[in-house]
Amino acid sequence: MAKKPVLTAAEAAKMIPDGATIMCGGFLACGQARAIVKELVKLGTKDLTLIANDMGRAVGPMGEEFFGIAELIHNHQVKRVIATHVGMTPEVGQQNTEGTLEVCLLPQGTLAECIRADGAGLGGVLTPVGIDTLVEESPFCLGRQTIDGKDYLLMKPVHADFALLGAYKCDE
């Protein structure tokens, strides 16, 4: 028996204010909450920070232009992205070069651990990954620590105001 949704995509999108930080699930737009993203596009919600593995796709599987969260980037509704991979969305690089989009790239495991650290209430994560790379220049890097002769980067937790996950079917 079909139940009425607890919340429609439009109602969910209206809960997200300008300037919010949103964590988005999925990989190459699979698993992203595309219905809510479409509603955010309609509402024109702006100055968003997106945290995701990637920034969606420049072209969708049915030929759609700017698939998933890439549509928010295309519409200049995003001011900052925190991701592990942005290569499938060339507009990210273009807007970053133009100075209209801040891009913070983190290794995939580091991003996952920094998200986990926030959820666990930890003050940070030590990782040997990213030493002497642009990761060390990230706003999430608090510096190096040496423990038992080995160097680590101390990374801040990554926090979001909202998390959007795509689902075909879910419970309350």
List the predicted regions and their residue ranges.
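Conserved alpha/beta enzyme-core scaffold
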Residues: 1-172
